[in-house]
């Protein structure tokens, strides 16, 4: 149908369609000029939830997001006469989405999230009309979507030892909350990570590695205070167990340096005087200190 014939159809519409409801014209009018968008939109969850006909015009169909369509119709189109998300500032896009999604998304958390603060709008990640991932209406598969901005993380997931995101065994959102988390930072690194709650422990890691949760009678302070990332990379590493160093003892000696049997001023145990670190027998610390994340039996994590 060409543009002239489309507009000819509007001449046949009842005047009441434009006169009532403060400029709301109904989604069937939108369908006349936007048949391609309509053909995909009516199949997705948004359409199902807002096109039931049980809600008032401002919460029904296309106009629940794009606003009253009368001026847009009378002007024969144009982004200046309708709520057009492609030109809307990110904070305004968020306001529109939160009209419905405020129950599932915390207004405070999402407004202070690093995505929002860096100008990432809802439609930067979500494809509202048509989506390759219908469950969350994502514009792409989740990992590909995240890699679009976080290319450095894509490289880490290609390392020999990594969390298996590319293989489909887990997703970015298993650890990260893209809409903002209760904890503004991932405590162990002190950098914004938008992860789920981290109250007293490293919750993103412990969701899977629950055996490391504790509490233990004898805590390894670096685990409890500074966190998992002090020893492990979170995404990928050239070292087994995602360790930050290729040899275990070099990692341990970053804290347990000095000689003699005792403690440093900060309370950290020094390297044992009986351990000759040039001897390969002493270079794999965890061969003896097997409960390195914490123990209920031994202060030196020997069992």
Model feature map: region roles:
Residues 2-10:
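Sec-dependent signal peptide recognition
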Residues 3, 18-303:
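Short sequence/structural segments immediately N-terminal
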Residues 11-19:
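Hydrophobic h-region of N-terminal signal peptides that target proteins for export
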């Amino acid at each position: 149908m060409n543009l002239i014939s489309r507009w000819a159809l509007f001449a046949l519409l009842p005047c009441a369609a434009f006169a009532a409801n403060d400029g709301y014209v109904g989604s069937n009018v939108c369908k006349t000029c936007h048949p391609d968008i309509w053909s995909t939109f009516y199949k997705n969850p948004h359409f199902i939830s807002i096109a039931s006909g049980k809600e008032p015009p401002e919460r029904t169909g296309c106009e629940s997001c794009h606003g009253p369509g009368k001026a847009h119709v009378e002007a024969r189109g144009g982004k200046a006469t309708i709520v057009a998300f492609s030109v809307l500032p990110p904070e305004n896009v968020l306001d529109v989405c939160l009209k419905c999604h405020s129950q599932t998304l915390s207004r405070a958390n999402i407004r202070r999230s690093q995505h929002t603060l860096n100008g990432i709008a809802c439609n930067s990640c979500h494809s509202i009309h048509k989506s390759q991932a219908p469950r969350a209406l994502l514009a792409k598969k989740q990992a590909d979507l995240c890699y679009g901005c976080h290319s450095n993380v894509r490289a880490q997931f290609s390392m020999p030892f990594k969390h298996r995101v590319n293989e489909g065994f887990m997703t970015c959102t298993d650890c990260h909350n893209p809409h903002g988390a209760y904890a503004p930072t991932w405590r162990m690194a002190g950098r914004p990570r938008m992860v789920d709650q981290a109250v007293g422990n490293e919750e993103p890691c412990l969701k899977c590695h629950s055996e490391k949760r504790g509490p233990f009678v004898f805590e390894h302070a670096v685990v409890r205070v500074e966190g998992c990332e002090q020893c492990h990379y979170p995404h990928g590493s050239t070292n087994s167990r995602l360790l930050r160093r290729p040899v275990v003892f070099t990692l341990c000696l970053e804290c347990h340096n000095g000689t003699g049997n005792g403690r440093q001023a900060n309370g950290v145990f020094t390297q044992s005087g009986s351990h000759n670190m040039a001897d390969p027998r002493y270079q794999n610390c965890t061969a003896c200190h097997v409960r390195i994340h914490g123990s209920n039996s031994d202060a030196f994590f020997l069992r």
